[in-house]
Design a protein with these regions (language model features):
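Boundary at the C-terminal end of the N-terminal hydrophobic targeting segment
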Residues: 35-37
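Bacterial N-terminal signal peptides
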Residues: 20-31
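Primary mode marks residue(s) on the alpha4-beta5-alpha5 output face of response regulator receiver
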Residues: 39-207
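N-terminal secretory signal peptides that target proteins for export/translocation
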Residues: 1-17
């Protein structure tokens, strides 16, 4: 498997950070919405008991994500398809980390939920300077989603309710809906929570 070292990625993509985010969000209102999705509470909740149907749906969704993103185990392929590094390495004070987010600004601007086309692919920096694919993130700008009258409520994907993230936020984005899926690294707190307790940004050499 081909890999791209972290310092190389940072040098190649740092300039694109502000440009891509400005292009993707220039037309979007920064005002918060009154949506009733799950809030972005900083701590992970304990996994809840699930029915067999829920478990089957979750397994099916994870499989779709894995099948659709397997090629991105080589981060160079993600870059070729329009994903660029944003936000540095996202970590939390006491709940682990989210890792490195490679964002496809075109997919974000479209605002479409497609399990085979995540807006973000997530990597963890490793001790040897490489990147390991660990999951994906589906991200929708809240004001755009809520303005569409065909939507009867907050976004869901195969039964998984998106989390609502208010503005202002650490990412400098308008309020948004997000759904992390830890398809490539098992999360003891569940496959669809925001934070991964076993992900670390310690090996990240960028800013």
């Amino acid at each position: 498997m081909n890999v791209v070292q972290v310092p190389t990625i940072v040098r190649n993509l740092a300039i694109q950070f502000h440009r891509s985010m400005i292009c993707a969000f220039a037309f979007i209102s920064i005002w918060s919405t009154g949506a009733f999705a799950q809030t972005s509470h900083p701590h992970n909740a304990s996994p809840q008991a699930q029915t067999d149907d829920q478990k089957n749906n979750q397994s099916a969704l994870i499989k779709i994500v894995r099948d659709s993103t397997e090629r991105f185990q080589d981060v160079a392929e993600a870059v070729r398809e329009g994903y660029t590094l944003q936000f540095g390495c996202v970590s939390g004070p006491d709940q682990g980390a989210m890792g490195l987010h490679f964002v496809n600004s075109d997919l974000v601007s479209r605002g479409i939920i497609d399990p085979t086309r995540p807006q973000i692919v997530i990597y963890e920096p490793t001790g040897d300077g490489h990147l390991k694919l660990i999951g994906v993130d589906f991200l929708l700008i809240a004001s755009v989603w809520d303005a569409d009258k065909t939507h009867t409520g907050p976004p869901q994907l195969m039964g998984q309710l998106f989390h609502f993230w208010e503005s202002p936020n650490r990412f400098g984005l308008p309020a948004f809906y997000t759904l992390h899926i830890w398809a490539w690294k098992e999360n003891p707190n569940g496959a669809f929570v925001n934070w991964h307790p076993n992900v670390s940004c310690q090996s990240f050499g960028g800013n």
